[in-house]
């Protein structure tokens, strides 16, 4: 009996499989045509920014395809899931995959938060007004919230962030507002030992407020 009970407990933490059939999935409440157009513009500007920077300085690099492969995930998150901080809500926390930074800059350009001159300064942060290569809150404190490079840093930080929030909630030090911690991983990142270094902690601590996308 004890063995059977233990097996049932272990199964609770097994891999989750989405069993919702397509015909029962809820449709998006957004305008898909507009969202697809916006997504296309952001993908284009992201790639164009990297190309233009490398025409001036070929050694810059820039991971031209990373954002494109996850553009839909980021776009849906921005438009329908992620909630910003305000006076009544602490806000969701997003750990962006580091190599996808060009896409975040491209979106900010479309929203009017960055200008063309700044995009032309991608990966030239040693110059005034240059955009950092990766999410870097020390270099760009008004843009980035969390550092996620070197590779593997993002997933580990996200898990420990979720654990700390859970710790505070369980002790009544902060309110449980339903905030989520999102982490986006990829571009070979899972080969880094740090990427899986804290994954067991997420299971043991039952961190149901963390969402990890690979």
Q: What is the meaning of each model-derived region?
A:
Residues 30, 34-42, 46-55, 66-205:
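Cofactor-binding active-site loop characterized by glycine-rich and histidine/acidic residues
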Residues 13-19:
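Terminal amphipathic helices with adjacent charged low-complexity linkers/tails
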Residues 1-8, 12, 213:
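Single conserved hydrophobic/aromatic residue that forms the stacking wall/gate
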Residues 21-24:
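Flexible, low-complexity linker/boundary loops enriched in proline and small hydrophobic residues
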Residues 60-61:
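Flexible, glycine/charged-enriched surface loops at secondary-structure junctions
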């Amino acid at each position: 009996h004890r063995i059977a009970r233990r097996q049932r407990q272990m199964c609770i933490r097994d891999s989750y499989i989405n069993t919702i059939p397509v015909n029962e999935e809820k449709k998006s409440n957004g305008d898909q045509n507009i969202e697809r157009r916006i997504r296309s513009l952001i993908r284009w500007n992201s790639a164009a920014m990297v190309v233009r920077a490398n025409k001036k300085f070929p050694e810059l690099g820039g991971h031209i395809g990373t954002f494109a492969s996850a553009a839909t995930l980021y776009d849906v998150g921005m438009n329908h899931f992620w909630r910003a901080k305000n006076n009544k809500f602490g806000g969701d926390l997003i750990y962006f995959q580091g190599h996808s930074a060009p896409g975040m800059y491209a979106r900010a350009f479309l929203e009017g938060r960055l200008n063309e001159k700044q995009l032309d300064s991608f990966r030239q942060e040693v110059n005034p007004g240059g955009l950092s290569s990766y999410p870097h809150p020390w270099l760009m404190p008004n843009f980035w919230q969390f550092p996620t490079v070197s590779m593997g840093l993002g997933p580990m930080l996200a898990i420990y962030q979720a654990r700390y929030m859970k710790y505070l909630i369980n002790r009544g030090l902060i309110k449980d507002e339903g905030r989520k911690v999102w982490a986006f991983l990829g571009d070979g990142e899972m080969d880094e030992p740090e990427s899986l270094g804290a994954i067991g902690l997420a299971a043991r601590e039952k961190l149901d407020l963390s969402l990890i996308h690979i």
